[in-house]
Amino acid sequence: GPMFSGHTPFDASGMIVAFEYVSGRKREVQPADCLGLVLVWTRTRGPLNVLQLVFGLTYTNLSVYLRFGIRLFVETFRHDPLASVRIPSAETIETFKDAFAVRHPLLNDCWATMDGLKLYLQQSGNCEIQERYYNGWTHDHYVTSVFCFCPDGTIPIAFFNVPGSVHDSQVAEFGNIYNRLEEVYLSTGAKCCVDSAFGNVTREYLYKSCQDLLGSNAPTREERLLDLQKKRQATSARQTAEWGMRGLQSSFPRLKDRFVYEERGERRITLKMLVLIYNMRARMVGINQIRNTYMPHLNRDANNDVQF
């Protein structure tokens, strides 16, 4: 309402600016229409022709209101407790550690998992720029992101829209993710479970699914078996990050489209909006494989527990 009515995307500068209608024809597109356009866009793929028919807008107006709606969503919900990307309280982290310990008893101090995600990007006409986004292993162009996932399915830490040539561990370094995970470890003793991509050095606040904690240095056979079991449980726990990536991409098929190359910040704002919607959906709707697996009690219906 107020954000939509008090701003306009039709300024001569191309920016979204504060505006008050004092004369002339009012906009026929209402706030609900703009929000619906943004949400339907996230749930579809391909060109916008179908959305033109659904919303009755020409291509130019549809593109303008889509850009307008995405920015209004980010501005409205970036500090909302249901949608924001934030590290939970110490009490909540303790419940996350308990949730992991139920399924993985040897990882009783794990509170989250982390992994990287590559999203397709159009090639730039400039060879030097194109090289930044090219990944030689998969022979394509990407933007790279790193996300952490909690047992309730939410994203507490994220860093996205990094050129595809950057390794996941470097993304975590550039995005200050390692420092934030270390702060959580120092304050609560909680660790994050990752795969072998995150750093060659040992970090005490990370569980690596391939990390040889003791290996042949273990003095007894029992300790070697315990070390092997811990690595297997870390591998199993890290699967939650794959579920989270799948949940993010299946919830928003638009992510599977190839992003248009531009340098105006559209990708960053779009990715930020999708993460906010994902968190809000995880907290309010609760349809999430991670949450259903690790914290099924959050989905219990009181009607099934109370006998009338």
Question: Where do the language-model regions lie?
Answer:
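Basic, low-complexity segments
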Residues: G1-Q30, I287-N292
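Short, amphipathic alpha-helical "recognition" segments used to contact nucleic acids or chromatin
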Residues: P31-T44
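Short, well-ordered secondary-structure "scaffold" segments embedded in the functional core
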Residues: P31, P47-F308
